Every structure is written in C-alpha cells, then in structure tokens.
C-alpha cells in the first residue's frame, strides 16, 4: 500500500483516521487560510483541503495525502472563534433555537501521480432553546473559547443540541470517514482488503 499521510496535526482527525486501522503519518501543512473575495464557504473548505494536502507533498512525494478543512456557517456568516466568555455568550445566544451548517472539505491527493479527488460534506446541527443559565453553565464547564461557534461537539457541547443531521457523525468532528473510504477506493486503496494484508 502507498504511504498514507494525514495533512493535519488535529488530534481529533488523527483519532478518527485511526478507526480505519491503516498505518499513516501526520504532517503539519503550512497554508494561508484566509478566505478569498466572494468565496463561498463550500469553495473555501474545498480549496483549503486541497492546499493542505499539497502543502506536505514535498515531504511525501510518493504518497496518498489526506487534506481536510472545516467551517461552520450560521445565517450565511462563517463563524469565528470567540476567544473569551463574553463573545461566546453572544454566539450561543445567536444559535439558540436555530441551526448551524458545518461544511467539511475533504481531499485525497496522490503526490506521485499529481491526482486530486476532493469533495465537500455538509452536516447540520440544530440547537435547543438556550437559557442564559444553560449558556453560562456550559461555558464555565468547557471553556470552548478556541473553538469556532463556542462549543465542542465532541464534549459537553452535545447538551446544547436538539438534533444532528448528516450522513456521518465523524464529519462534525472534522473528517468525513465514510466519504474518505470512498475516495481512498478511487485511488486504489480498499480499506477492508488492506486489513487482510496487515493481519498476515
């Protein structure tokens, strides 16, 4: 099997990829993540996923490199990180009783063949009606000030939601695993077939 590389230092993406039980390396991509003028959220995450995968190709010239990027959008506005309690309160008040769409760009890049396959996977989070007490209790417990949207869906943030809507819960955490299996197959890697080789 060709070397598999995750173009990310995110511990959450690493944990998700480990579910496939394939050996892989992690590499940090140096990419300018500034959005371009009039760029849609979907176009932004697809472009950045591709750029992140290609950014580590000089280190791994004969590999399949996975790139991923995610933004959260509410009422057509890309959500930033709150950085402090007061900003987080404003964000969560805005989300109360509403929904947020996460767009995750996913790319698998064959650095030997210069072949790129990419897609964008949406995932929708519906929020409960949140009281000021709910918001304060949550923020004091989890302090998600470095998280876009002011919550950690993989932690206590789940208490804020009324419903999750999407094809793959891994997408919400940053790596659409079902779609990744399909992209790897298009690049010639059958994840289940590789398991039999690994156990020999």
Swiss-Prot record:
<dbReference type="GO" id="GO:0005737">
    <property type="term" value="C:cytoplasm"/>
</dbReference>
<dbReference type="InterPro" id="IPR003697">
    <property type="entry name" value="Maf-like"/>
</dbReference>
<keyword id="KW-0963">Cytoplasm</keyword>
<comment type="similarity">
    <text>Belongs to the Maf family. YceF subfamily.</text>
</comment>
<feature type="active site" description="Proton acceptor">
    <location>
        <position position="69"/>
    </location>
</feature>
<dbReference type="Pfam" id="PF02545">
    <property type="entry name" value="Maf"/>
</dbReference>
<protein>
    <recommendedName>
        <fullName>7-methyl-GTP pyrophosphatase</fullName>
        <ecNumber>3.6.1.-</ecNumber>
    </recommendedName>
</protein>
<dbReference type="GO" id="GO:0009117">
    <property type="term" value="P:nucleotide metabolic process"/>
</dbReference>
<keyword id="KW-0378">Hydrolase</keyword>
<feature type="site" description="Important for substrate specificity">
    <location>
        <position position="154"/>
    </location>
</feature>
<keyword id="KW-0546">Nucleotide metabolism</keyword>
<comment type="function">
    <text>Nucleoside triphosphate pyrophosphatase that hydrolyzes 7-methyl-GTP (m(7)GTP). May have a dual role in cell division arrest and in preventing the incorporation of modified nucleotides into cellular nucleic acids.</text>
</comment>
<feature type="site" description="Important for substrate specificity">
    <location>
        <position position="70"/>
    </location>
</feature>
<dbReference type="GO" id="GO:0047429">
    <property type="term" value="F:nucleoside triphosphate diphosphatase activity"/>
</dbReference>
<feature type="site" description="Important for substrate specificity">
    <location>
        <position position="12"/>
    </location>
</feature>
<dbReference type="InterPro" id="IPR029001">
    <property type="entry name" value="ITPase-like_fam"/>
</dbReference>
């Amino acid at each position: 099997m060709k070397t598999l590389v995750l173009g990310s230092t995110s511990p959450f993406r690493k944990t998700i990829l480990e579910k496939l039980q394939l050996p892989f390396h992690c590499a940090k991509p140096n990419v300018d993540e500034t959005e371009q003028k009039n760029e849609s959220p979907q176009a932004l995450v697809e472009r950045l996923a591709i750029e992140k995968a290609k950014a580590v190709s000089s280190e791994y010239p004969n590999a399949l490199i996975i790139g991923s990027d995610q933004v959260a959008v509410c009422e057509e506005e890309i959500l930033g990180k709150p950085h402090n309690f007061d900003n987080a309160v404003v964000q969560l008040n805005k989300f109360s009783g509403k929904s947020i769409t996460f767009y995750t760009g996913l790319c698998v890049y064959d650095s030997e063949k210069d072949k790129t396959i990419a897609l964008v996977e949406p995932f929708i989070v519906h929020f409960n009606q949140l009281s000021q007490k709910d918001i304060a209790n949550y923020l004091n417990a989890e302090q998600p000030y470095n998280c876009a949207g002011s919550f950690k869906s993989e932690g206590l943030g789940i208490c804020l939601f009324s419903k999750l809507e999407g094809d793959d819960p891994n997408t919400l955490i940053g790596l659409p695993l079902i779609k990744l299996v399909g992209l790897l197959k298009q690049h010639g890697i059958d994840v289940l077939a590789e398991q039999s080789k690994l156990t020999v």
